[in-house]
Every structure is written in structure tokens, then in C-alpha cells.
């Protein structure tokens, strides 16, 4: 059931979610022009000042509750239900607020997959995440790359739009469905059919703020705030199967330079860019993934809300490369002088930009001397967490329970613990079963439908999607015993579909060289602590687990020259030999920028999700064993003749037993706390063993 919009005059209409509907003193959440104040703007004295707090959520990924559907357990370190408490606190602190979401909102948990794929929401139903956001009275939002993961028809429906794109009926023939009660803006994704933006590129919100005149009087005055949204142009690769031929993207700078002058001409006092991307100051490209550094240089932007990178900004102690670029002030929270915030991910932080405003007689401008930026965590200084807003869980109780019931569906059993705690150093325990399922599926299809490729060997590749980025609980961990759908979702995190590509032996080598970017270059002659794992994402650390394929990774060599002794069936791999590799749509279409993988090598684009293929494979096999499904190591680190280096990496605390069970040697835990504040320990690996 769709919740009615909350208003300042009709609070009882949403009594069930009353504690989410915090009253704004001056700034409402409705997508309407606020009631004109008693004193019109033109009469506000020159020098009148005000404070407007921009509140940001980003990369919520449908973590509505503090709950892990993979482990079927509470996880107090995340969840919108706790951010909702921070929102309430900020609204009490500041008389004027604007609550905005940065995107990557509708995908990311078993709840989102249940509502999109298992029991799709009806046209008259509002997604669980949008239901609670409506109740929280968001003022606006952007669109992230993951919004496109389920396809354009679904996105059109759940956002309450009627996209005019190929594959959908004409807008007049589409039914406008339930969606968010706040405007969503996106300026750089264009319909190929109409050459018009897929979403509204920007909107201008008129809000009444409480202000102070130069003589100290309190007055009400309208402020016009323009919001404009951007998403990574790389969606055209990542979700090519849904988007190719239907939409295209423009660069962030180009879109901003087109629309911001329009926004100003239409009376926007302020312009807030909602950019779902991080910071990258390399040579500008209209297709660059993280273009927010360049966006900040476009004239006319007063503040930026950024995301996508799953990081915290500002953070004075951050060692993250993008926050230590020229022009980036990680203490004050500015990018090339523009106040900027990134509020982490999964509901771990609330971004707050407190804008100091000054009225010059015609318009409101930002007083940077009165502007501050912070990302407020849901974790308190004493390591406890802020209380959850109970109305959030009450609002989606039915959806939550239905998801739990679904993921408890039994599918098989395992005799070993399938985890990714030591995937970075060679444990295939949570990878091999995925590779087996993909290979079995592709082999069957090729034999039945692609006789021209039937003689080619089929390999399979996947990555440890959960490799500790989010801390000690961010690992795949499936206990021995009965297997259910939630375990399969833990093994395969994303709603990808199976793709098969035809590649050469040389392509396989290049594929592995790219995956080996996961590691830093180690100098074995230096008796210093040297971090093994780089910032290269774990979800791009592709691994083969075939008895026919073997290779070594030499981390003493530079990127691009690390793969040694690459063999197929015991002989050096032939660069010209042809192989079929089972993978996913993201990788086959260019995700991760692997050489040669740009969509052109795809021979089979399956409609079936990798996770569903995995579930079917486990059901067919019934009993999964370490000997058959979790012990095939295709790769090892090159053994060093000697080394005095202290090569270290992070993983969850007290997991050495898992390393031993996987047959890994030379690993010790050297510190119970790695100092990151993410519940990780420091381990050391001896590369001479």
C-alpha cells in the first residue's frame, strides 16, 4: 500500500510512521512550492542571514534495517533505521534542512532482490526503501548506477515514471505507478528515442527558511534551491544488456554546463549537485566513472553531494587517494572550494553541509566563512550505535518477514565452512562452487545451442565479492550444514546474469594480469611492513579454479608483469588457443576495465542470474564437499627464495583456523586490531613458504 504524502498540516494521516515524520521548522519535504511567507523576499533587508543544512544519504543499497539477510542476524553497524535517528537530531539542531539522497538506493540486499525478482512489487505498491524515505520526507534524490541493475521497465515503474524508450509502450499507454514522493533528478542519461533526459534533469525547490535580519529580528523568507543529478557514464558498460540502444550518457561537465545556467535563469538562488561518483583528477573524459572533481570546477555549483565510492568525506585522517588530491580539503570538506560531503554507504553515516546564507537584496548566496561540512556516523564514540527509529521497522515488517521466509528456502548442504576470509591469499572455498555452477551451465548451453563452439574448453571465473571492504563482517561466511537461498546470496552477492566470452590464451593472461592489480608491489629486500592488498576492489579479483589451469602471481613484479608459469593441462598456455570463459554481464561488458572485455567477445548472454544458476547447481548436486568443491587452487603466489619483508593484510579477527582448514601455510595473526576501526585484524604471510 502506498503511504500518503506527509504534510505539516496532515500529520495524523501517517500516524503509523509518526516518528519518521519529523516536522521541519521552515523546510518541508513535499515536492511543492512552500507557502509564501508573510514577508516577501523582496522586502528582506540586505544582509539578512540564514543557515541551511543539506542532509545526505548515499549508497543505502536497500539496507532499510540493521539486518544482514545473508547471515539472518542483526547488524547494528548499518541501516537507514539508525540514520533516521540522525536525521531527526539534525532537524532539531538546524531550523532549516533539506534531505537529499544520492542514489544506489533500490538494489543491494536480499530485500531488494525479493521485491524486484522473486515477488515483483505491483504498480500500486511502493518499494520498501521508498516507503520509509517517503515517511522521512526526503526533499529530493539522485540516481545511482545500481538503479539500472534491474532494467528500465522496472526502474520506470518503481520510480513512478513513464520512460519514453524503446522496449516500453508510449508514455500515454503506461500507467504511472507508485514511487517516491520526492523529485528524482538525473541530467546525464538520455533517451535514445527522444534525445531528452530519461529523468527530470533538475528541479528547483522553493523553501521557506527562518532567517535573521541585520538588526537581529527573526523573519521567514523563501529560498530557491536547484538540485541537479549525475550518474557514472560507465553504466553503459555495466548494464549494457538493459541500456544498449535505449539510452546514452553525456559527461558530467557537459550536462552541468548545459543545465546550470538554465537553473540560474529560472531563479535558483543555490545549486546543489547530487553526483553519484567520487573524485578523479586524471584527464577529463565524458565517460569517466568518478567525475565529481571535474564537476566541482563548473561555475555555479554551491555544494556537492557525492557517493558511489563507499567512503567518508570529509575525514581529516583519510588516506584514501581521492581525498588527498590537489584542490581537495579533507579537513574542511571542500573540493576546489565547493563544500562537498560523502556519507559512506549502507546507512552508516549522514552527510551534513551547513550552508551559511546571506541575502544581497536580490538573491541568496553562500557565505563560506559560515559553512561547515561533516559526515556523522551512526556509531558513537564509545563504539555503541545510535538507537534505531522503531517506526522504520514497523513500516516494512511484512516485506522484511517475506524476505526472510524466502531466503530460508533449503537448497542443499555443505561439509565445510565456505568463506572468503583468506580469498586474497589463495583460499578458493567460496569461489570454486560459483565457478563450477557457471561452467556447468555454459557447457550445457553451448553443447545444445552453439555447435560451432562445442569443441572449445570452458573455463569459469568469479571473484570474492565480500572481501572486507566494509569491515570484519563484510566477508562471505557459510557454516557447514544445511544450505539455503540466503547462503547462495552470500556466495554470489550481485544480481548479475551469466555471460560467456570467447577469448584467446593471450586474453586469459591479460585477464589475470588485470586481476593481479589486487596486490601492491612487494620489495623482499626491505625489512619493513608492506601491505599486500592494494585499493583495487576485491570484486575485480577474478579467480579461476580449474584443475586444467594453473598460474602464479609474483607480487615482487610491477603491475602487468606478475603472472608466471601459466599452464593449461600441464603445458604453457598457447597465446592463440581459444577458450570459452563463463563470467557475468558486468565483466563481459567492460566492468573493471579488463583488456579486450568490452562486449565484443560475448557469445552467450544468458537471461539467468548467476545466483539462480548457483542455486540450481547446488540443488542438483545436493551435497557440497570441500574435496570436490572447495579445494581446487589454480593459483599461488610465486615462492620467494628469500624475503625480509613483513607482508601484511587485513581480515576478520581470529580466523587462522579457516586458513589452516583451507591448507594455507605461512600465515600468522600479528595484531588483533589493525587500527582501521572496522573490526579487522592484521595478518602476515611468509612468501618464502
Task: List each model region and its residues.
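Glycine-rich phosphate/diphosphate-binding loops and the adjacent beta-loop-alpha structural elements
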Residues: 406-427
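Gram-negative bacterial Sec-dependent N-terminal signal peptides
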Residues: 16-18
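C-terminal motif of bacterial Sec signal peptides marking the signal peptidase cleavage site
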Residues: 23-26
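Feature captures C-terminal
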Residues: 48-53, 63, 71-78, 82, ...
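Acidic, metal/ion-coordinating pockets
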Residues: 31-32, 36-374, 433-440, 451, ...
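Bacterial N-terminal signal peptides that target proteins for export
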Residues: 3-14
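Short, solvent-exposed aromatic-acidic interface loops
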Residues: 231, 368-384, 567-570
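Active-site or pore-adjacent capping/gating segments
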Residues: 350, 368-369, 373, 386-395, ...
Amino acid at each position: 500500500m502506498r503511504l500518503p504524502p506527509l504534510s505539516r498540516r496532515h500529520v495524523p494521516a501517517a500516524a503509523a510512521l509518526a516518528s519518521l515524520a519529523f516536522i521541519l521548522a521552515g523546510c518541508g519535504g513535499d515536492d511543492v512550492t512552500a507557502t509564501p511567507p508573510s514577508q516577501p523576499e523582496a522586502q528582506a533587508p540586505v544582509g539578512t542571514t540564514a543557515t541551511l543544512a543539506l542532509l545526505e544519504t548515499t549508497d543505502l543499497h536497500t539496507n532499510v534495517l540493521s539486518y544482514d539477510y545473508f547471515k539472518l542476524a542483526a547488524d547494528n553497524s548499518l541501516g537507514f533505521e539508525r540514520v533516521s535517528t540522525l536525521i531527526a537530531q539534525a532537524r532539531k539542531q538546524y531550523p532549516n534542512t533539506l534531505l537529499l539522497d544520492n542514489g544506489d538506493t533500490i538494489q543491494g540486499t536480499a530485500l531488494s532482490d525479493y521485491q524486484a525478482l522473486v515477488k515483483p512489487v505491483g504498480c500500486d505498491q511502493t518499494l520498501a526503501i521508498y516507503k520509509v524515505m517517503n515517511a522521512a520526507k526526503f526533499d529530493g534524490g539522485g540516481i545511482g548506477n545500481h538503479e539500472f541493475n534491474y532494467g528500465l521497465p522496472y526502474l520506470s515503474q518503481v520510480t513512478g515514471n513513464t520512460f519514453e524508450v524503446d522496449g516500453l509502450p508510449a508514455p500515454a499507454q503506461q500507467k504511472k505507478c507508485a514511487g517516491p514522493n520526492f523529485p528524482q533528478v538525473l541530467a546525464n542519461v538520455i533517451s535514445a528515442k527522444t534525445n531528452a533526459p530519461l529523468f527530470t534533469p533538475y528541479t528547483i525547490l522553493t523553501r521557506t527558511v527562518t532567517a535573521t535580519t541585520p538588526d537581529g529580528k527573526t523573519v521567514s523568507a523563501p529560498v530557491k534551491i536547484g538540485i541537479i543529478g549525475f550518474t557514472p557514464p560507465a553504466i553503459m558498460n555495466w548494464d549494457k544488456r538493459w541500456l544498449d540502444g535505449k539510452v546514452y550518457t553525456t559527461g558530467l561537465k557537459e550536462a552541468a554546463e548545459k543545465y546550470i545556467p538554465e537553473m540560474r535563469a529560472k531563479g535558483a538562488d543555490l545549486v546543489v549537485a547530487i553526483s553519484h561518483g567520487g573524485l578523479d583528477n586524471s584527464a577529463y573524459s565524458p565517460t569517466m566513472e568518478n567525475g565529481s572533481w571535474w564537476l566541482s570546477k563548473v561555475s555555479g555549483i554551491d555544494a556537492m553531494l557525492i557517493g558511489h565510492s563507499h567512503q567518508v568525506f570529509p575525514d581529516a585522517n583519510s588516506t584514501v587517494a581521492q581525498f588527498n588530491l590537489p584542490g581537495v580539503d579533507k579537513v574542511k570538506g571542500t573540493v576546489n572550494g565547493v563544500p562537498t560531503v560523502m556519507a559512506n554507504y549502507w546507512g552508516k553515516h549522514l552527510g551534513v553541509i551547513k550552508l551559511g546564507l546571506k541575502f544581497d537584496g536580490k538573491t541568496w548566496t553562500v557565505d563560506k566563512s559560515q559553512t561547515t561540512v561533516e559526515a556523522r556516523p551512526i556509531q558513537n564514540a564509545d563504539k555503541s550505535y545510535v538507537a534505531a527509529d522503531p517506526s522504520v521497522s514497523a513500516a516494512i515488517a511484512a516485506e522484511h518477514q517475506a524476505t526472510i521466509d524466502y531466503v530460508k528456502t533449503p537448497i542443499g548442504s555443505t561439509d565445510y565452512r565456505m568463506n572468503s576470509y583468506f580469498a586474497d591469499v589463495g583460499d578458493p572455498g567460496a569461489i570454486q562452487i560459483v565457478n563450477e555452477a557457471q561452467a556447468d551451465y555454459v557447457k550445457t548451453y553451448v553443447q545444445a545451442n552453439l555447435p560451432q563452439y562445442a569443441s572449445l574448453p570452458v573455463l569459469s571465473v568469479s571473484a570474492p565479492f565480500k572481501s572486507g571492504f566494509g569491515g570484519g563482517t563484510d566477508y562471505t561466511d557459510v557454516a557447514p550444514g544445511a544450505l539455503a537461498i540466503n547462503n547462495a546470496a552470500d556466495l554470489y552477492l550481485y544480481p548479475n546474469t551469466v555471460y560467456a566470452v570467447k577469448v584467446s590464451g593471450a586474453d586469459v593472461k591479460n585477464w589475470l594480469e588485470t586481476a593481479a592489480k589486487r596486490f601492491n608491489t612487494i620489495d623482499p629486500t626491505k625489512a619493513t611492513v608492506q601491505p599486500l592488498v592494494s585499493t583495487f576492489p576485491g570484486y575485480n579479483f577474478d579467480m579461476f579454479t580449474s584443475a586444467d589451469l594453473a598460474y602464479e602471481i609474483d607480487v615482487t613484479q610491477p603491475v602487468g608483469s606478475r603472472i608466471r608459469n601459466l599452464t593449461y593441462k600441464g603445458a604453457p598456455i598457447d597465446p592463440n588457443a581459444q577458450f570459452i570463459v563463463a563470467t557475468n554481464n558486468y565483466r563481459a561488458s567492460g566492468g573493471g576495465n579488463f583488456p579486450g572485455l568490452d562486449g565484443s567477445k560475448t557469445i552467450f548472454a544468458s537471461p539467468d542470474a548467476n545466483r539462480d544458476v548457483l542455486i540450481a547447481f547446488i540443488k542438483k548436486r545436493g551435497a557440497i564437499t570441500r574435496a570436490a568443491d572447495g579445494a581446487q587452487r589454480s593459483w599461488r603466489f610465486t615462492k620467494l627464495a628469500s624475503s625480509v619483508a613483513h607482508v601484511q593484510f587485513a581480515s576478520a579477527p581470529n580466523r587462522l583456523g579457516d586458513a589452516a582448514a583451507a591448507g594455507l601455510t605461512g600465515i600468522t595473526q600479528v595484531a588483533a586490531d589493525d587500527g582501521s576501526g572496522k573490526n579487522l585484524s592484521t595478518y602476515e604471510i611468509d612468501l618464502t613458504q
